[in-house]
Amino acid sequence: MSNGPLAPGYDSDILVEDDVRLPRMYRVLLHNDDYTTMEFVVSILVEVFRKTAEQATAIMLAVHRDGVGECGVYTFEVAETKAAIVHARARREGYPLRCSTEEV
């Protein structure tokens, strides 16, 4: 007869933890160009990356000043999806805005 939730024959005093690994994380970067408007970049940051207007403006200015700015850090699938959404919206609006991902 079992004295706990474990199957018969198992010692309920010994618990084995599984090796839990966190997923690799990726940063999403926006790259500066001479054609995409600052307003469009801010709108992308607000709509796609859920930034506040103040955060979006700060990131947009970093992109403009430094040539690149970080939008956020996500799991691989989320980062790649957000980058694809940025590219699709930029192309639809006629902008050459580039977005990339890199492992943290």
Swiss-Prot record:
Protein's GO biological process: protein catabolic process; proteolysis
Coiled coil regions in record: none
Protein purpose: Involved in the modulation of the specificity of the ClpAP-mediated ATP-dependent protein degradation.
Similarity comment: Belongs to the ClpS family.
Binding partners and assembly: Binds to the N-terminal domain of the chaperone ClpA.
Protein name: ATP-dependent Clp protease adapter protein ClpS
Naturally occurring in which organism (per UniProt): Nitratidesulfovibrio vulgaris (strain ATCC 29579 / DSM 644 / CCUG 34227 / NCIMB 8303 / VKM B-1760 / Hildenborough)
